[in-house]
């Protein structure tokens, strides 16, 4: 169990920025359920959905950015959980890039790999492991997306979501699994003690040039598209 509580290079919860957040929120003084719920809601809604420079950035950088996607929000979520003594681990997958269509458009959608490395966090709670993925999209973004496609009442894939119930996805935590991209999964990479271990084996299939283009150009275009949705445009 110690492995699921350890600080790592990516899960750097002793960083001053994270410690400052912990002190202000005082999650460590709450019962276990309220700890998980408070951290979950924080990562879901106060860390906005958006694309960071790469997957392998430490939790402190995700916090400083104020936005993230499945992998980077997961890193921050895990760091905050471990900081209050809640065991957690990472489950890795590949998702179909169709899930990103809308946020990713045109030439940069065509050039992206067919499969994208994805993850969710498994949290130990009352002697069982819960799958936690529903923190990826902040509520304001998801709400505007639901309004934009209000005629859709069943399954939906695109704009960062893949679910069987678009208008009521499983994103609210009450001792349950939460999901928002699960239906886009095409491969299961298994369970890892930490994101460091996972990303040492599985990374996005991008050439050095495409990786640079993503960091310097593409992600900014994607973030602009996400902001426009969040603003109702």
Regions found by a protein language model. Give the residues of each.
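Secondary-structure boundary elements
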Residues: 1-65
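Active-site neighborhood of thiol-dependent amide/isopeptide-bond enzymes
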Residues: 51-116
């Amino acid at each position: 169990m110690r492995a699921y509580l350890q600080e790592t290079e990516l899960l750097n919860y002793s960083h001053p920025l994270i410690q400052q957040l912990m002190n202000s929120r005082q999650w460590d003084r709450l019962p276990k359920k309220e700890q998980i719920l408070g951290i979950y809601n924080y990562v879901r809604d106060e860390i906005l959905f958006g694309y960071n420079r790469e997957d392998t950035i430490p939790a402190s950088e995700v916090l400083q950015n104020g936005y993230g996607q499945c992998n980077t929000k997961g890193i921050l979520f895990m760091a905050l959980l471990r900081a209050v003594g809640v065991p957690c681990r990472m489950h890795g997958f590949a998702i179909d890039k169709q899930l990103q269509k809308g946020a990713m458009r045109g030439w940069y959608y065509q050039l992206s790999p067919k499969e994208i490395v994805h993850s969710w966090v498994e949290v130990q709670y009352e002697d069982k492991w819960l799958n936690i993925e529903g923190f990826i999209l902040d509520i304001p973004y998801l709400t505007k997306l639901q309004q934009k496609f209000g005629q859709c009442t069943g399954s939906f894939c695109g704009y960062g979501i893949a679910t069987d119930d678009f208008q009521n996805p499983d994103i609210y935590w009450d001792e349950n699994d939460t999901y928002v991209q699960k239906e886009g999964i095409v491969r299961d990479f298994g369970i890892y003690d930490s994101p460091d271990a996972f990303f040492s084996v599985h990374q996005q299939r991008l050439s050095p040039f495409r990786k640079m283009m993503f960091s310097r150009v593409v992600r900014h275009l994607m973030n602009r598209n996400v902001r426009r949705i969040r603003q109702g445009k």
